């Protein structure tokens, strides 16, 4: 609705949750809720528990990453029954942007063998190993090493094209990675509450705005 820059500003605490532009985002979301676009009791399912709705034909689409492809294939859906599309443009005046989090490796600050850990890190992020690890028959993800090869997989290729050329507005992480932890926690609770009780929007936004004033 508002684009990448607005998202970053909201995540940084620079925009009020009661801003009319935030409300417009929820208004767009409310249209989907009111038309019954979500399965019943959606708030109770993990992403793994939601996949059978796709497999059994009880849901037509799911907003999820490439990691869901392997279990969907294992459940019996071949590529003739699966497809991928980028989230639709809501405002033609706003450049398309995407959420595409990057998974990272870390060495604990109190690790006892940091030198060997660093060598392992160099090994695992090498172009060759990133190609192997992220192949379609392995993790099925896009490698983080720019010199790695992207496996010739239908969905990996589509994801690569989307992030490299079809997201001119920018690429962000997930909500709970972009926002400070405390704000993200309260924000997620508010978003989940809205999906079940959309009439609570004013109360939700006031609560999140109060949290913004305290957290930032």
Residue ranges and their predicted role:
Residues 56-64, 80:
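Alpha-to-beta junction loops
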Residues 85, 135-186, 193:
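Long, aromatic- and glycine/proline-rich binding clefts that accommodate carbohydrate-like moieties
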Residues 3-24, 74-77, 89-97, 148-154:
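Short, solvent-exposed loop/beta-turn-alpha elements that line the ligand-binding surface or hinge
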Residues 47, 64-69, 101-103:
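Beta->alpha turn/N-cap motifs
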Residues 35-37, 74-140, 189-192:
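Extracytoplasmic/periplasmic substrate-recognition and gating elements
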Residues 1-11, 26, 34, 99-108, ...:
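Periplasmic solute-binding protein
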Residues 41-55:
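Short helix-initiation/N-cap motifs at beta->coil->alpha
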Residues 12-43:
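Glycine-centered hinge/linker elements that transmit conformational signals in sensory
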């Amino acid at each position: 609705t508002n684009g990448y820059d607005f998202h970053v500003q909201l995540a940084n605490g620079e925009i009020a949750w009661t801003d009319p532009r935030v409300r417009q985002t929820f208004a767009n979301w409310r249209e989907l809720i009111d038309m019954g676009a979500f399965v019943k009791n959606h708030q109770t399912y993990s992403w793994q528990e939601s996949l059978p709705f796709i497999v059994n034909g009880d849901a037509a689409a799911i907003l999820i990453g490439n990691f869901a492809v392997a279990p969907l294939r294992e459940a019996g859906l071949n590529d003739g029954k699966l497809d991928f599309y980028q989230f639709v443009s809501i405002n033609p005046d706003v450049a398309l942007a995407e959420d595409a989090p990057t998974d990272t490796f870390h060495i604990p600050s109190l690790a006892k063998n940091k030198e060997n850990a660093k060598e392992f890190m160099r090994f695992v992020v090498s172009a060759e190993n990133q190609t192997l690890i992220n192949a379609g028959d392995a993790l099925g993800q896009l490698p983080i090493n720019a010199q790695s090869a992207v496996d010739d997989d239908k969905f990996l290729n589509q994801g690569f094209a989307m992030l490299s050329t079809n997201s001119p507005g920018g690429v962000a992480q997930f909500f709970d990675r972009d926002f400070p932890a405390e704000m993200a926690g309260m924000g997620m609770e508010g978003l989940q509450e809205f999906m079940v009780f959309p009439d609570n929007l004013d109360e939700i936004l006031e609560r999140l705005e109060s949290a913004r004033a305290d957290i930032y």
